[in-house]
Amino acid sequence: MRGFSTQNSTFVDGVRDLGALSRDVFNLEQVEVVKGAAGSDIGRGASSGYINLVSKLPTLEDAISGTLGYGTADKSNLTADINQSMSDNSALRLNLMRRDGDVDGRDTVENSSYGVAPALAFGLETDTRLYLYSQHVRQNNIPDGGISTIGMDGFYNADASLNAGAEVDSDNFYGSKSDYEDVEADMFTVKFEHDLNDVTT
């Protein structure tokens, strides 16, 4: 945000997210962006602001939705969002995700991931509410360090010998085929809310 790293200024449901993970949006209800100095709000963090990711939680409205997609570079995408009420004030929600595919214009690079996010809610539409929810994400990727910008329009380096270099093919892969990025992330959250009055929770 405005030239500052937000690595330590990213929150999930109001809790600081310290994991270095490329997060998927399959289980997000909304993204809140707060701009400006926010030290009095969140404590230590970037002076540019912070980001809060809000997870999907159960509601009393029964609903099923999903997405299915296929794109270039053999990209495939599948998501499902299932919400089911269990009583007058409790509900269950399940979000699922599966993604596979290569990267456009790049050889060798592949990305694969899946995610499961169950959630339970009790006391919905009452003064006291309890939410129990978790998320499991697994990623199996081949890391891509990109390509050299030598020879591209606008490239400049104080070393004249580099300026004379030829442009490389964007399909070239400069990593190792045996390299891997194997990520497994689990989160479990308990949220308790109680309405003290009409304006205070």
Label each region the model flagged.
Residues 4-6, 15, 36-38, 56-58, ...:
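Solvent-exposed coil/turn segments that connect beta secondary-structure elements
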